[in-house]
């Protein structure tokens, strides 16, 4: 009659058994984490922008560049926006942002100064959370990659004339630019509503941030 072998398993076999169970444990843990995340997202109130600050429309918060556009291009400005002031500024700002999104400007330009790649030396201090706490950043436009310069604090860096020339023919102001022409921002050589609006938006970016 045979005897029962009670000798311990070889060391390699005893170590292999827990390792064989590891993928199953990892799968179960992954599903548990997934369920927890779904439940938390389902029961947690997600911010819809109720507590964010809106761009302040009073005259003192409107960049000087907006009034300069009205002086430099009085006829198209009045035709499309009326007199320069809080109401026309809000309209231009909204249309400008919509144009920025529709034209894919966010694909080549960021609105976030990062702590890497020499960004602070080129564009100033690293972007902080409160800097984007306004309704114009819902949804955010941090960008997808950096082809052109960061625009997070573009306000006042360049003149309106520079932006007009740049949109009309980018290589006229930067021979190595890969940016396309935006001729549909103009009627003849003067900016139309989209042209005035997107320049207004760009000249606003960062104007609501106290520079230190």
Predicted features along the sequence, with ranges:
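C-terminal capping alpha-helices of c-type cytochrome domains
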Residues: 18-43, 160-212
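Residue-level detector of secondary-structure transition/capping positions
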Residues: 104, 113-116, 171, 206
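Alpha-helical transmembrane signal-anchor/signal-peptide segments
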Residues: 44-65
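Electrostatic cytochrome c docking/interface patches
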Residues: 65-101, 113-118, 212
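The canonical Cys-X-X-Cys-His
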Residues: 96, 102-112, 163, 179, ...
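N-terminal positive-inside, membrane-proximal cytosolic segments immediately preceding the first
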Residues: 1-25
């Amino acid at each position: 009659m045979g005897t029962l072998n009670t000798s311990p398993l070889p060391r390699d076999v005893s170590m292999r058994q827990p390792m064989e169970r590891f993928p199953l444990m990892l799968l179960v843990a992954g599903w548990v984490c997934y369920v927890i995340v779904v439940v938390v997202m389902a029961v947690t109130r997600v911010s819809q922008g109720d507590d964010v600050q809106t761009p302040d429309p009073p005259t003192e918060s409107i960049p000087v560049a907006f009034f300069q556009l009205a002086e430099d291009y009085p006829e198209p400005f009045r035709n499309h926006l009326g007199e320069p002031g809080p109401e026309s500024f809000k309209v231009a700002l909204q249309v400008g942002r919509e144009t920025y999104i529709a034209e894919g400007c966010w694909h080549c330009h960021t609105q976030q100064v990062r702590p890497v790649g020499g960004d602070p030396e080129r564009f100033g201090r690293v972007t902080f959370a409160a800097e984007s706490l306004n309704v114009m950043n819902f949804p955010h436009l941090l960008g997808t990659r950096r082809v052109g310069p960061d625009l997070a604090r573009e306000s006042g860096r360049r003149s309106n004339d520079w932006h007009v020339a740049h949109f009309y023919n980018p290589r006229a102001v930067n021979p190595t630019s890969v940016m396309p022409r935006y001729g549909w921002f103009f009627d003849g050589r003067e900016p139309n509503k989209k042209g005035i609006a997107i320049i207004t938006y760009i000249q606003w970016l960062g104007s609501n941030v106290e520079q230190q």
